[in-house]
Design a protein with these regions (language model features):
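Acidic, low-complexity/disordered tracts enriched in E/D and polar residues
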Residues: 1-35
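Radical SAM enzyme [4Fe-4S]-AdoMet core and its adjacent flexible, acidic
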Residues: 63, 221-237, 244, 248-352, ...
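Local cysteine-cluster metal-coordination motifs and their immediate loop/turn environment
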Residues: 108-118, 366-369, 403-420, 474-481
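Radical SAM/AdoMet-radical enzyme domain recognition
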Residues: 135, 139-155, 164-288
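Short Fe-S-cluster ligation motifs
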Residues: 139-157, 394-396, 432-476
Length: 483
């Protein structure tokens, strides 16, 4: 399968299954578009009719171009066969290990964000803080079910996890002890709204957390529209100085500013640029997912605006990078020379199988958006996964699980998409959240274009970097989890 698009002056041709990316002139671009369904003579005639007045386009040149396209097809770099579907079929029968937990240490929050999917941290239930005993058992569950996998991921989540900070500190200390006993390596992430950040939190996170996610929606008026405290006051003025101090002391350790855009700020690039101008360089901005009747919900009329915004963002990132003031955007981080192996590209995030959410009471769910939905209760941290039917349903979530995705050029980049978004949009975890698909495909086009621009700049300096994904890193070819 081949996908062609034009963006920022580049004519880009992507071969889906090989991952090869080709940057061509407009003549070759049109030749490739005609190649599958036309003879060489038909292509030459059409191209001469369109470009025949140009001195640099001759019949001989066109036939050479057609031969080059044929060579690329023969070498598997255009219209490469899809040989991966059988791998996806095997996933449902494989034994999986648990490699990551989203630990809900607080089902309560000190903000009252009106768009919160988690009902201000309560997840449609009671307010609660996780006890140390439950947290410790959750870590034991992770160790016991991780098999030979050494690196284990734990995300301290909520609600607002810093409302249970003392327990978090005790739990991390416990995990550091268990690492030595079981030959494991825990990597922690903290997701916080920032209200409770102080020097103690900063020092702890910089010592213990592999990554930190800091919630900021961008411009003050945008952020404060939704992210208010219970007295109705916006939180921007409180958290921005805290975040700036946090990031200043963070050094080269990982962090992300994570925002949400809605119908009210479809010009969300201005929020990203605002965060960059505040000095933050690791940025992410997510589209709101909510009931279509919600006034903040994104609409069909918003879609072309959002796609244009992603293009504006990509072009500005290239510009700022050249000026020495670049920043990273999470959804544009794509590795076209290595990247994840084909097993990962097919199977996605592993929710419900390799990754689970744990409530303050020790219940297990496939991931945090499913928490509180009795249909998706997997079990608990004492008895393990007892609802094996739901787990097996999640095993089937992959790039080949949906008929609608079979002819989609982006399927090996989205890995089938987010199961939670699909469920909330369609009622099925293997449904298709079409709005999200459209945004994802535009993000991928922009991400690839940025890589093309970077490669062309390197090529101008005499540095050649081929853009082509390998099919597998072989790390998990035998069914073992990637490290």
């Amino acid at each position: 399968m081949v996908h062609q698009y034009q963006l920022n002056g580049y004519n880009i041709v992507l071969d889906t299954c090989s991952g090869s990316v080709h940057v061509v002139d407009e003549v070759a671009y049109d030749v490739i578009a005609m190649y599958p369904d036309h003879t060489a003579d038909e292509i030459v005639a059409a191209m001469m009719a369109k470009y025949g007045d140009r001195e640099d386009v001759t019949e001989a040149d066109l036939r050479q171009c057609i031969d080059d396209v044929a060579s690329l097809k023969e070498s598997g770099k255009l219209w490469s066969p899809d040989t991966y579907e059988n791998l996806a079929f095997d996933f449902k029968n494989r034994n999986t290990v648990v490699k990551a937990l989203c630990l809900h240490v607080a089902h309560t929050c000190n903000l009252n964000c009106s768009y919160c999917f988690a009902s201000q941290g309560r997840y449609q239930g009671e307010r609660a803080l996780m006890s140390f005993e439950v947290g410790k058992r959750a870590m034991d569950f992770l160790i016991e079910n991780s098999g030979s996998r050494r690196n284990l991921e734990v995300d301290f989540f909520g609600g607002e996890p810093l409302m249970n900070f003392d327990m978090v500190k005790k739990l991390v200390a416990y995990c550091r002890e268990q690492e030595k006993i079981h030959n494991k390596n825990f990597r922690f992430t903290m997701t916080t709204n920032g209200m409770l950040i102080d020097d103690d939190v900063i020092d702890f996170c910089n010592k213990e957390c592999h990554n930190v996610v800091l919630s900021l929606d961008g411009r003050k008026e945008v952020h404060d529209r939704f992210r208010k405290d219970y007295a109705g006051h916006g939180s921007y003025d409180t958290i921005v100085p805290k975040f700036q101090e946090f990031v200043k002391k963070r050094g080269d350790k990982g962090y992300y500013m994570r925002g949400t855009f809605t119908h009210y700020n479809t010009d969300f690039t201005n929020d990203i640029f605002h965060m960059a101008d505040l000095g933050f360089t690791e940025l992410s901005m997510e589209p709101v997912v909510c009931d279509p009747s919600d006034p903040s919900a994104l609409t069909e009329a918003d879609l072309p605006i959002l796609k244009e915004q992603y293009e504006i963002l990509a072009k500005e990132m290239i510009k700022r990078n050249r000026e020495g003031r670049g920043f990273t955007f999470y959804h544009y981080m794509i590795d076209l020379t290595g990247g994840p192996c084909i097993y990962k590209r097919i199977s996605g995030c592993g929710s419900g199988t390799e990754y689970m959410a744990v409530t303050p009471w020790g219940d297990l769910y496939p991931c945090h958006p499913f928490v509180g939905d009795p249909k998706y209760l997997l079990g608990d941290i004492w008895k393990g996964v007892t609802n094996t039917a739901v787990r097996d349903e999640f095993k089937h979530c992959n790039a080949y699980a949906r008929k609608e995705c079979q002819d989609c050029w982006a399927k090996l980049y989205c890995s089938g998409g987010c199961a939670a978004n699909s469920y909330h949009a369609t009622g099925s975890i293997t449904g298709v959240y079409e709005y999200g698909c459209e945004l994802f495909k535009k993000r991928m086009e922009c991400a690839i274009m940025i890589k093309v621009a970077e490669n062309q700049e390197l090529a101008a300096k005499g540095i050649e970097v081929p853009i082509e994904l390998g099919s597998t890193c072989n790390a998990c070819a035998d069914g073992e989890a990637c490290e």
